[in-house]
Amino acid sequence: MLDVCLLGSGGMMPLPYRWLTSLMTRFNGSSLLIDCGEGTQIAIKEKGWSFKPIDVICFTHYHGDHISGLPGLLLTMGNADRKEPLTLIGPKGLERVVTALRVIAPELPFEIKFIEITQPEQTFELNGYRLKAFRVNHNVVCYGYTIEIDRAGKFDLERALSQEIPKQYWKHLQKGETIESDGKTYTPEMVLGAPRKGLKLTYCTDTRPTNSIRE
């Protein structure tokens, strides 16, 4: 299941009931944040979500209303004694911009990994889903993002029974795992039907009309 929370949709300045641009997703126990405008931390708390599972933060571009909340979020993560590395993804210049913002957050107990987007389109494999970055038409270099999640076929009970596959292996095969036991190999394809239609979420902020969104 993919959970989606639009934390903010405002521009330029935060309003009492409309925080600056930010979107958060949850999948397979990890969270992804796209943009981190001023007040994003408060919006996360208001929605009852948590910053702790965030392992990837993406930026569409580097205008202040899309990134100014990052230093405070990094400090909060550090104060919570985070040890897991954090991956940041954004247009070229990401490391330079974040390094400048970290003047007020110079020491953190976790590693920050930078991935800079250098092509009009780039795809990343992250925690069981694909993240596609695509260039849009803004007055600075700006990207939208698409999350794609493949879905395996449904478990076929009759096939499992007809092939005499031990019941204790069913849940592992459903997860896509291959089991070897007593000289036999059991694969997910033996018990799963045709792949189901996947999930797709596209997020785009500042842009003029562009075909890259439709594609």
Question: Where are each of the predicted segments found?
Answer:
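A gly/proline- and charged-residue-enriched helix-loop-helix capping module
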Residues: R96-V103, F114-Q119
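Active-site-proximal loop/helix segment associated with metal-binding centers of metalloenzymes
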Residues: L15, Y129-R214
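Short acidic-hydrophobic surface loop/beta-edge motif
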Residues: T25, E121-L126, I179
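Conserved beta-strand segments of alpha/beta enzyme cores
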Residues: D3, T87, E111-K113, R130
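Conserved beta-strand hairpin/beta-sheet module of binuclear metal-dependent hydrolase folds
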Residues: M1-K47, K83-P85, Y145-I147, A194-Y203
